[in-house]
Curated annotation (Swiss-Prot):
NDH-1 shuttles electrons from an unknown electron donor, via FMN and iron-sulfur (Fe-S) centers, to quinones in the respiratory and/or the photosynthetic chain. The immediate electron acceptor for the enzyme in this species is believed to be plastoquinone. Couples the redox reaction to proton translocation, and thus conserves the redox energy in a proton gradient. Cyanobacterial NDH-1 also plays a role in inorganic carbon-concentration. The lineage of its organism: Bacteria, Bacillati, Cyanobacteriota, Cyanophyceae, Synechococcales. PANTHER family: NAD(P)H-QUINONE OXIDOREDUCTASE SUBUNIT M, CHLOROPLASTIC. This is NAD(P)H-quinone oxidoreductase subunit M. It is found in: Cellular thylakoid membrane. Its EC number is 7.1.1.-. It is an enzyme of class 7 (translocase). NDH-1 can be composed of about 15 different subunits; different subcomplexes with different compositions have been identified which probably have different functions. It catalyses: a plastoquinone + NADH + (n+1) H(+)(in) = a plastoquinol + NAD(+) + n H(+)(out); a plastoquinone + NADPH + (n+1) H(+)(in) = a plastoquinol + NADP(+) + n H(+)(out). Belongs to the complex I NdhM subunit family. It comes from the Bacteria. It holds the Pfam family NdhM. One of its GO terms (cellular component) is plasma membrane-derived thylakoid membrane.
Length: 110
């Protein structure tokens, strides 16, 4: 059975990607970061999110694979994205389809 957690910027599925389709899996989690391209990313920032995801998944090892636990992981990754935005590691994509500043209005350093 396919389980999923969807937040504004993080989507987690209990599935593998085969072609362009998600195939349910009991052993694989698939992470989709910023599916709406709201942020500008570099490889280092993406790797930081992936490492945190791996650490969180490992910390839940042995626990039930449930939508609740997937939501907890997704929520913790959202917190990381906010911290990265505030630290300047990522920035808003001004060419995004919709500018809604979901993590807060950009701050100018004076």
């Amino acid at each position: 059975m396919l389980l999923k957690s969807t937040t504004r910027h993080i989507r987690i599925f209990t599935a593998e990607i085969e072609g362009n389709e998600l195939q349910p899996s009991d052993t694989v989690l698939t992470l989709d970061v910023d599916p709406d391209n709201e942020f500008n990313w570099n490889e280092e920032a993406l790797q930081k999110v992936y490492r945190q995801f791996d650490d969180l998944v490992e910390s839940y090892a042995g626990q039930e694979l449930s939508e609740y636990n997937l939501r907890r992981i997704g929520s913790e990754l959202e917190v990381l994205l906010r911290q990265m935005l505030q630290a300047g590691e990522i920035s808003y994509n001004l060419n995004c389809r919709v500018l809604n500043y979901s993590m807060g209005v950009p701050q100018a350093v004076v």
